[in-house]
Amino acid sequence: MQQRGAAGSRGCALFPLLGVLFFQGVYIVFSLEIRADAHVRGYVGEKIKLKCTFKSTSDVTDKLTIDWTYRPPSSSHTVSIFHYQSFQYPTTAGTFRDRISWVGNVYKGDASISISNPTIKDNGTFSCAVKNPPDVHHNIPMTELTVTERGFGTMLSSVALLSILVFVPSAVVVALLLVRMGRKAAGLKKRSRSGYKKSSIEVSDDTDQEEEEACMARLCVRCAECLDSDYEETY
């Protein structure tokens, strides 16, 4: 009976130890952490960057590998589009041929790639997998890519912003110019009624003021011409 009790006590004592080892094992298994953007939006013909970063408890060696895969919408089939091990190996077949570029740096924990000349057909889910032995088990983040055309609304917003930057200052200048001209006209009428005659100094000041007003008017015209040219280039 005493032997059974001793064996039972030893067995019970093993449970806390196994628990510690188990939790330590879980910590080691997930010591490689990978992060990527959940959603990325791009436009047709404009280069898109798919960002992926990782943190590993082990030093980076030539055994580190990076794999990017692509899954089309409404499909369970995935295809490899990029592989890295000491050197980058973008896919040489399929729709992504000659369009995948390496823009990462493994020594900085960056496993990002870019897609050139994207099209609407590139919409889908991209996955980034990193293995850095002995860290080989990790989460697999997924990025949902949405590629669209730059529509009229996007161009219109750019034109609206340009209009605000050009027209608002011009409107302020014109308003100030009109106020000054109105005050000057009112003063001239008042002086003409009272038979007042200007001195040579006042005549000189009026000439300088007229030149300043003419300069401001030319500035407004230049701003309007600049806006017209930018608007034509946009469309």
UniProtKB/Swiss-Prot annotation:
Q: List the disulfide bonds in this chain.
A: 52-128
List this protein's GO terms for biological process. Answer: cell adhesion; extracellular matrix organization; hair cycle
Q: Topologically, how does it sit relative to the membrane?
A: Single-pass type I membrane protein
Instruction: Keywords in alphabetical order, please.
Output: Cell adhesion, Disulfide bond, Glycoprotein, Immunoglobulin domain, Membrane, Signal, Transmembrane, Transmembrane helix
Which InterPro entries does the UniProt record give? Ig-like_dom, Ig-like_dom_sf, Ig-like_fold, Ig_sub, Ig_V-set, Myelin_P0-rel
Membrane side Extracellular: which residues? 32-158
Q: Per its UniProt entry, which superkingdom is the organism in?
A: Eukaryota
Which residue spans traverse the membrane? 159-179
Question: Which Pfam family, just one, is annotated for this protein?
Answer: V-set
The segment(s) forming the Ig-like V-type domain are 32-148
- Signal peptide (residue range): 1-31
Any one GO CC term of the record: plasma membrane
Cytoplasmic side of the membrane: what ranges? 180-235
The protein's predominant localisation is membrane
Instruction: Please list the residues annotated as glycosylated.
Output: 123
Q: Which Gene3D superfamilies match?
A: Immunoglobulins (2.60.40.10)
- Spell out the subcellular localization from the entry: Membrane
- Output the SMART domains linked to this UniProt entry: IG, IGv
Q: Its biological function?
A: Mediates homophilic cell-cell adhesion.
Its family? Belongs to the myelin P0 protein family.
Name the UniProt record assigns to this protein: Myelin protein zero-like protein 3
Q: Which species does this protein come from?
A: Homo sapiens
Encoding gene (name): MPZL3
